[in-house]
A protein has these predicted regions:
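Residues lining hydrophobic/aromatic ligand-binding pockets adjacent to catalytic sites
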Residues: 1-9, 80, 102, 109, ...
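Active-site-adjacent pocket scaffolds in enzyme catalytic domains
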Residues: 1-5, 14-15, 34, 111-218
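C-terminal domain-boundary segment and adjacent tail
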Residues: 85, 113, 202-243
Length: 243
């Protein structure tokens, strides 16, 4: 209701109706569609060459973590059921607040395991707010061994200078850790958002195609980040096609 009323500026009565409507009437409920695409591709390539990660953002009261939702809600349970159907691995997306208070990472992991009764298969930060080496150290000490945050919002590409995962180096000891950083190659908002690259569809397709081919040429890991809302044609005209 609050998302439809405050974010989408729908009239209160329409927002109330949407909050009680079936999932298929929700423009943002794109999970069955894109998870089916992902599973078809993974089955074609083989499990050793493709993985589906479904990240669940942990709630906080920080303004940039809105909307504040309940991870125990029936809606989230339905999303998880779709993820399980298509064999998606469940990851933890830390709140934006955790990007500024690293001690929250462990707290949010404990909450994740309590609610979903499983260990998260990976970590990423909301809005890519893994800002300091201490954030990565806290992730490591909280039990994470795979981090998918490494990237920047403004430009797509090889932000570590490589398309392959690398181990995090503890800057205090100058030693390798077992925390693997999976560099982000392509992100939906980076391509289209006016604050970033602001590309049109044809330009975005050309950039994405070049990055995919370059990653393949060097036997890299193509790490993609797409948001469920932008995969709705009602929310964005071409991200569903590009994905």
């Amino acid at each position: 209701f609050l998302r439809a009323w405050l974010k989408e500026k729908k009239p209160p009565l329409q927002a109330l109706r949407l909050s009680f409507s079936a999932d298929v009437e929700d423009d943002y409920y794109t999970y069955p569609k894109f998870l089916k695409w992902d599973r078809e591709l993974c089955d074609k390539l083989g499990e050793d060459r493709g993985q589906i990660m479904l990240f669940i953002r942990m709630p906080s009261r920080h303004p940039l973590d809105k909307p504040l939702y309940n991870p125990r809600s029936p809606y989230i349970r339905r999303v998880l059921a779709v993820g399980a159907k298509y064999k998606a691995r469940l990851g933890l997306q830390c709140s934006y607040a955790a990007g500024h208070r690293a001690e929250r990472i462990k707290q949010e992991r404990m909450l994740f395991e309590k609610i979903f009764r499983q260990k998260p298969r990976g970590l990423r930060h909301n809005k890519l707010t893994s800002c300091e080496p201490e954030d990565l150290l806290q992730a490591y000490f909280s039990g994470f061994r795979n981090d998918y945050t490494m990237g920047y919002a403004d430009v797509v590409g090889f932000r570590l200078g490589t398309a392959r995962p690398v181990k995090f180096i503890n800057p205090n000891t100058r030693l390798l850790t077992e925390l693997i950083l999976h560099p982000l190659i392509l992100r939906d908002l980076t391509l289209s958002d006016p604050r970033y690259m602001a590309l049109e569809q044809a330009e975005a397709e050309a950039v994405a195609t070049d990055l995919v081919r370059t990653t393949a040429r060097y036997n890299g890991e193509l790490n993609l980040l797409w948001h469920n809302d932008l995969l709705s044609p009602q929310a964005h005209p071409w991200h569903s096609v590009l994905y």
